[in-house]
């Protein structure tokens, strides 16, 4: 993993703050610039999903095959080596990996969350945006809803950023990692392997194209809303469009985290694979 590659997945989507929203009520140009910036960020994330989908063709991430292939090697590695003898051995690493054990434990949970919610919320957002465009009364009520595009549903019961940063520092990029820094002992490789295989099976690559297409649908709707913005003097419509912009920020970050969880799963799996393969080659 290199810094440029990681940055594709970690930049934040712009968010419309309350003060900006009030300014936006007074200036169509302000709202349009914000929407353009948000849509550009979302479009960049969509492109990253496409890149990921291209690199990891098939049903799951490519690393799943390698994980399954090393299963029988793990017991041999544990029997062959003492932890104290190999803990300072370096293997190809991941950006700021803090704990391989914790990563393997939490990634299946994070994957369940993004798989269950991302596409569902995006698809429901298309329906809501269609209604926003067609129904004046709905536009008036839209701005009163704190969860207009379903982002709170997606965040329910889990904070993805907190969970990710508990086992990986996304601001630190390294080429290698010491075995002793990421696992407490060699026996932990067995449960790590089991959890990462579970995570690998949860990486539903085939859904990424659906997510891309749904994002494109959202972009199309927002372009229509931009057109509405240029042809109205109605204050309710102005404020409602500001609310759309704010909700789009949440949707953009939702997709960013979805792709980031998939990406981290692949990179963390590589570390486990590299540890086992490296130790297999070392003579005791």
What is the role of each PLM region?
Residues 1-102, 106-109, 114, 118:
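Leu/Val/Ala/Ile-rich N-terminal alpha-helices, chiefly Sec-type signal peptides and the beginnings
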Residues 65-284:
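Long, low-complexity or tandemly repetitive, helically biased scaffold regions used
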């Amino acid at each position: 993993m290199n810094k440029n590659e990681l940055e594709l997945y970690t930049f934040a989507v712009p968010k419309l703050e309350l003060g900006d929203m009030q300014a936006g009520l007074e200036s169509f140009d302000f709202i349009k610039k914000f929407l353009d910036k948000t849509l550009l960020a979302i479009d960049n994330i969509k492109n990253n999903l496409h890149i990921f989908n291209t690199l990891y063709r098939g049903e799951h991430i490519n690393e799943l095959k390698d994980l399954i292939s090393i299963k029988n090697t793990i017991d041999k590695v544990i029997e062959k080596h003492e932890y104290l003898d190999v803990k300072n051995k370096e293997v190809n690493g991941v950006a700021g990996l803090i704990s391989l054990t914790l990563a393997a434990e939490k990634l299946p949970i994070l994957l369940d969350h993004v798989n269950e919610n991302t596409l569902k919320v995006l698809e429901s957002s298309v329906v809501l945006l269609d209604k926003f465009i067609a129904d004046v009364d709905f536009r008036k009520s839209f701005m009163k809803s704190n969860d207009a595009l379903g982002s709170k549903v997606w965040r329910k019961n889990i904070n993805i950023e907190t969970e990710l940063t508990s086992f990986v520092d996304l601001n630190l990029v390294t080429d290698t990692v010491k075995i002793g820094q990421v696992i407490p002992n060699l026996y932990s490789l067995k449960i790590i392997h089991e959890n990462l295989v579970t995570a690998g099976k949860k990486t539903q690559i085939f859904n990424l194209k659906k997510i891309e297409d749904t994002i494109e649908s959202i972009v199309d709707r927002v372009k229509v809303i931009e057109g509405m913005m240029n042809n109205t003097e109605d204050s309710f419509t102005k404020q409602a469009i500001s609310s759309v912009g704010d909700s789009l920020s949440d949707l953009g970050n939702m997709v960013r985290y979805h792709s980031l969880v998939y990406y981290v799963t692949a990179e963390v799996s590589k570390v486990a694979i590299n540890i086992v393969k490296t130790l297999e080659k070392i003579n005791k």
